[in-house]
Amino acid sequence: MLRGLRAVARLCRYLSSGTLKRIPMELITNEFAFSFASDGWNYFRALVAEYEKNSNIALEDTTFFRFFQHERVRSVRYLNDLLFLHDPNGRSRNDGYKFYLGTYPWGDHVAGGPWGHYYDQVEGKTTRDLYGYRRNPWYQPGDRYPLEIEWNETIQLYHSITRGYLPLRCGHLPEVTLLVRRNGEIRAIRYNGQHRLAVLSLLGYKKVTALVPSASSISADLASWPTVSTLPKVVHQREVVVREAEVEDWYYVKEGLCTPEQALEIFHAFFELNGRERITYLGLPSVY
């Protein structure tokens, strides 16, 4: 009984650490604007869709694998490259400030700070194993090792969820950062729970209950994250709910590293892109 009471207490503390919202799946995207919407394209959702069609398919035969092996994807160095992969000659790819992976105009730490193979080469850092030994498929796209991990773990999660989705038994929900345009339009960028969102979206869930972490709780969480960023490990409220109207106060704008116009181009990309434009540009089958 004592164990049960402790579990309930932990759950209550967790639920009080932010704001619960029931969010339409159509408004949820990942940290690189690969949407979970029905008309979008997300590489983890494609993984699950392909496995659902053929459970005997080999990893190397999947669009998921071929996507990360594509020469255009393997050449990604910056966030700008990845968001605007389909527009190689565009202004964002060639002019202005380049954001390392893991960084955004409004701040670093919602995505864990700067990381990546190219970042390590330029800055003399070591970020490959920030989230576990070779766990990050975007650290050096094309590395088979993290893709095998993602493949196996996502399939296990798929089977678990198809037996019943009871997130609070696990003690946590998907967590998101909200982007809010001046007109009130929103996008929810996943903070935690990307694989779960991929499975739920494929299974037809129209809405999902998610937690928007409070500034204090997300800062406490980040205190345990490994990072090589020189920024303080504190996430301010504007970085949990990122508002277009506050662009002049975003970290990289305020520090003079990028212009408000460039910052907003990246911000609006999360509303205007959904991933399908990039998989189409690469000439790969979307699967779903």
Summary of predicted features, one role per range:
Residues 210-285:
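Active-site or metal-binding loop neighborhoods of secreted/extracellular toxin and effector enzymes
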Residues 9-16, 44, 48-55, 65-67, ...:
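Short alpha-helix boundary/capping and kink motifs at helix termini
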Residues 175-180, 198-199, 209-211:
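Ordered hydrophobic segments in well-structured contexts
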Residues 29-103:
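N-terminal accessory/pre-domain segments preceding catalytic cores
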Residues 1-55, 235-241, 249, 254, ...:
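Membrane-proximal basic amphipathic "stem/tether" segments
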Residues 181-203, 288:
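A sequence-level detector for short glycine-anchored, His/Arg-bearing signature motifs
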Residues 206:
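Short glycine-/polar-rich loops that comprise or flank the Walker A/P-loop
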Residues 69-138, 142-144:
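Extended, charge-rich helix/loop segments that form flexible
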